[in-house]
Curated annotation (Swiss-Prot):
PANTHER family: ELONGATION FACTOR TS, ELONGATION FACTOR TS, MITOCHONDRIAL. The keyword Cytoplasm applies. Belongs to the EF-Ts family. This is Elongation factor Ts. Coiled coil: none annotated. InterPro entries: EF-Ts_dimer_sf, Transl_elong_EFTs/EF1B, Transl_elong_EFTs/EF1B_dimer, Transl_elong_Ts_CS, UBA-like_sf. One of its GO terms (cellular component) is cytoplasm. GO terms for molecular function: translation elongation factor activity. Signal peptide: none annotated. It comes from Rickettsia canadensis (strain McKiel). The lineage of its organism: Bacteria, Pseudomonadati, Pseudomonadota, Alphaproteobacteria, Rickettsiales.
């Protein structure tokens, strides 16, 4: 086969279109004698063959996404290997498609088999994107929030495009309040608060009691070391537990937009203003990569990995 001249401009265009590596793009164009569309197919086929190898790689980057439709909201997390991919328009489109389907699917198992616009399932779509982007991708998790009446607030922090970013939050407010605009504004503010303050529960009764007892034990041991009488230690521990609750329980936290008031007090004031009860039924907070072990590599390992594909 005679030598085919492939310009750097075409290689760059193929890389931007597919997210594949520069050398992979150049080789694909050589193999297809410069045919751009055939080169895309070549990369996809090559990538599909290599998808099993990529599936073992740690994915701790990527994007979270939130979407609200009426009285239903969903949050998802789709992971990639590098932050670079999160800025890839193709990957962003994939995440948008998945979160749109999640509103109807309602469970992650149904979501994986849901059909995208190209009639491929979400699972198949992810595999195809592994092929063209050149990184392992995973639909890690999803959660749904539904209310019977009221408002759902959503907030995405560090957005790369609207509704896609590093932290996604939903907050459900059940209420018969007629002024939906003010109710939605409160739900939005509480969602922003949740993103920034990372509460562990709505109220103290729903807080993990194992966590509470662990903190209580730590506080007790610290107080005992100070040599105080037992009855004083008990009071000190209860005081520290109350402070702990004010740090991790949503309703007891100082409100981000008005720190002198707790979230509970802000809700009570809004109830008086709107003439209706307001109850936080659920909140969801997804932070990208939380709980995932990050793979540590030195520079030499990274270079070797790149050169060996």
């Amino acid at each position: 086969m005679s030598e085919v001249n492939i310009s750097a401009v075409v290689v760059k265009a193929l890389r931007e279109k597919t997210g594949a590596g520069m050398m992979d793009c150049k080789n694909a164009l050589i193999e297809t004698r410069g045919n751009f569309e055939e080169a895309i197919d070549f990369l996809r086929k090559k990538g599909l063959a290599a998808a099993v190898k990529k599936a073992g790689r740690i994915t701790s980057e990527g994007l979270t996404a939130a979407k609200v439709e009426g009285l239903t909201g969903v949050v998802i997390e789709v992971n990639s290997e590098t932050d670079f991919v999160a800025r890839n328009e193709q990957f962003q489109d994939l995440v948008k498609n998945i979160v749109n389907l999640a509103v109807v699917a309602k469970t992650i198992d149904k979501l994986k088999t849901s059909k995208m616009l190209n009639s491929k399932s979400v699972e198949e779509g992810i595999i195809e994107n592994i092929a063209t982007i050149g990184e392992n991708l995973t639909l890690r998790r999803m959660d749904i929030l539904e209310i019977s009446e009221g408002a759902i607030g959503s907030y995405v922090h560090n957005e790369v495009v609207p509704n896609l970013g590093k932290i996604s939050v939903l907050v459900g407010l059940e209420s018969k309040a007629k002024d939906k605009t003010k109710l939605e504004a409160l739900a939005k503010q509480i969602a922003v608060h949740v993103a920034g303050n990372n509460p562990q529960s709505i109220d103290d009764s729903s807080l993990d009691q194992v966590l509470v007892e662990r903190e209580r034990k730590i506080f007790f041991e610290k107080s005992k070391e100070e040599g105080k009488p037992y009855n004083i230690i008990e009071k000190m521990v209860e005081g520290r537990i109350r402070k702990f609750f004010s740090e991790v329980v949503l309703l007891q936290q100082g409100f981000l937009f008005e720190p002198r008031l707790t979230v509970a007090e802000v809700i009570k004031n809004t109830e008086k203003e709107l003439g209706a009860e307001i109850k936080i039924t659920k909140f969801i907070r997804y932070e990208l990569g939380e709980g995932i072990e990050h793979e540590e590599k030195n520079f030499a390992d990274e270079v070797t990995a790149i050169t060996q594909g």
